[in-house]
Amino acid sequence: MLIIELLKAIFFGIIEGITEWLPVSSTGHLILVQEFIRLNQDKAFIEMFNIVIQLGAIIAVMLIYFERLNPFQPGKTAREVQLTWQLWLKVVIACIPSILIAVPLDNWFEAHFYFMVPIAIALIVYGIAFIWIEKRNAQQEPAVTELARMSYKTAFFIGCFQVLSIVPGTSRSGATILGAIILGTSRTVAADFTFFLAIPTMFGYSGLKAVKFFLDGHHLDFAQVLILLVASLTAFVVSLLAIRFLTDYVKKHDFTIFGKYRIVLGSLLLIYSFFKFVF
């Protein structure tokens, strides 16, 4: 029944809206949830769905940060306009590694890593990394506390960290936040740049998935279009709340709790995978 599929779409949209911005892997969570709750659709649509519903989350970022990201915003001074263009240039530079590495390798990683065990391992590894980095930085002051002071070189290397998210379970936001902190930015700068970098990255990735879906000879029926729209709209609404939460959270807390969550979840998934294999 279509109503059941739409309820599932709402549920997946909630998962996407929350996990896209928290450093816990949205794609990984969608794959995991679909181990137990699946859309009654073909595999090609589900693979495309898992990526394209990110558009709702991206539109939420664009809405929240529209004035800050818009160089033509009325009332901006010449200096503010210059800083906005510089920010966009940093974002473009940070996209280069993904264009050169992640895009060509995407199909290979999708074929070999979109399974429970690789996701669980990635969750645990990056969970440990978050805890270790936060402990290492506990007594250190970040070198970059304003986005305007972040160099183009730092932006490029943050983009290199983003490439790591090609492995499901890594988390795009987790990889870029972790990379930015390692490179000396404050948590606030790391989170902000992660939000901004998501706009071209996820628009491009979603677009590529959609184009590939149609070039492979697939098409969307009315029910599938409705499922995508409902899931994306849900992801948009939930993302508005998740982004506000994370921006407020990082002002007072570190990312250790997310590291612990990743380790616990990854460990449970390894146990589940073991028993599923044995029995």
UniProtKB/Swiss-Prot annotation:
Example GO molecular function: undecaprenyl-diphosphatase activity
EC number: 3.6.1.27
Catalytic reaction equation(s): di-trans,octa-cis-undecaprenyl diphosphate + H2O = di-trans,octa-cis-undecaprenyl phosphate + phosphate + H(+)
Cellular compartments per GO CC: plasma membrane
UniProt keyword annotation of Acyltransferase present: no
Residue ranges of the TM segments: 2-22, 44-64, 85-105, 113-133, 163-183, 188-208, 223-243, 255-275
Keywords: Antibiotic resistance, Cell membrane, Cell shape, Cell wall biogenesis/degradation, Hydrolase, Membrane, Peptidoglycan synthesis, Transmembrane, Transmembrane helix
Top-level taxon of origin: Bacteria
Enzyme class: hydrolase
GO biological process terms held by the UniProt record: cell wall organization; peptidoglycan biosynthetic process; regulation of cell shape; response to antibiotic
Membrane topology: Multi-pass membrane protein
UniProt KW Cell membrane keyword: yes
Pfam families per record: BacA (PF02673)
Subcellular localization, as worded in the UniProt entry: Cell membrane
Miscellaneous section: Bacitracin is thought to be involved in the inhibition of peptidoglycan synthesis by sequestering undecaprenyl diphosphate, thereby reducing the pool of lipid carrier available.
Stated role: Catalyzes the dephosphorylation of undecaprenyl diphosphate (UPP). Confers resistance to bacitracin.
UniProt record similarity statement: Belongs to the UppP family.
Protein name per its UniProtKB record: Undecaprenyl-diphosphatase
Species of provenance: Streptococcus pyogenes serotype M1
Gene of this entry: uppP
